[in-house]
Amino acid sequence: MENQPTVDVIEQIKDIPIYQQSIAERFFPILEKPAIALDFPDNWMTPRLAAALRTGEAEFVLSTGTHHARMHIIRPPYFLLNSYYQLWSQHPDIGFTWQQQCQRVSLTTVLATEHVARVNARKYGKRTIETASSATRRLDARTTYLNQKLDPAQWERADIERMLDDIEAARHCHPHGFYHLDCSSYHLAHFILKVAQYGLGARFPKPASIIHAYEYTPANVRWFLLENFSCPLIDLFGSTELGYLYYNDRHGNYSPFLDKMRLELVPFATSNTIFSMIVSSVRNPYMPLIRYRSGDCVQTVDGSADPEKIVRFCGREKEMLRASHGIVSQADFDDLICGASPNIFVYQLHPEAKWQACLHYTTFNGAPLLPREAADLQRRIQEATGMDCTPLHRTHIDIGKSGKYAWLAKK
């Protein structure tokens, strides 16, 4: 049957309880997140996994939980990091910074920083975690995490100066001052704005290469980053439980990184242009996921369900807007935003009464849209969604407890 696991894959998962019924019935349905959590970890436990947990070859972690419940995962230590390093080292545009042993500084959510500090505390037998010392935020010989606050819009001068000190320390490890910057795109954009606000531009040495990952990057944010950096700016797409699946080049073209994986696309709800990603992966030997619905959506160049024709990652299933004109993805809505103004930075749609909404937005320069820009944006949203939407300028939009923004507010 189409999209069913091969004999080789079944051999690798034959002892895992969650798959016993599917193996017996010779049919694997789509694996949903609630099924993964059911009877966890017993539904995944095998003698091999139990032994790996005892020796430290496997560990329990939580997914980042961008705008949904955090999911329990079992994986090898540094599972996500190893696939990151493999992509970095082999990438044609930025592999040179790996080969030159450049230090990696990571500017992303405070949850990521706290995870590193927690791992280090366990390593040294400490009961409490602290992130003040750069040593506690050091993941390995190559990587240091920078951020210590939930909301990057609330960074103060002392926060920026401390992070610049960490970057300078990373530069000193290379004879020419090269370093690699890993980031979430929003965090880096906020960092650029804060550096300018506090007049610290002379202290910010530009990186030799940049990877942004961890969340959807709006077009205006990517353009803003491209305007501020001349080095290659690469996007990685993946998740905590799967590792990385795709990467792009400096021109924005995506390539697959489906090592020990297979991908299928199924239509999302009633849409004929948006597809849900269904991933079969044995990359993680302790928690292989077969026909797993990742919760991510894509669009293809010709509207077909061919994974080789993916042209963009368009958002999460749980953040699809069901409008009168049909389903609108985050990427579709983002097209409306950047079409109206390149100055819009963070935005959040607040649906109200039937087919009415408010769009809260901030801008890169802090000023509201010009009246003609606001009217154009309102028109674009109405034509694409059927919603009467009022743009409202804000100086600040709250970030989620995961350290990531939700573009679509819950009613």
Explain the meaning of each model-derived region.
Residues M1-E11, L139-K411:
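Active-site glycine/GP-rich loop and adjacent strand/helix microenvironment
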Residues M1-R127, T131-A153, C173-P175, H180-D182, ...:
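Nucleotide 5′-phosphate-binding alpha/beta core
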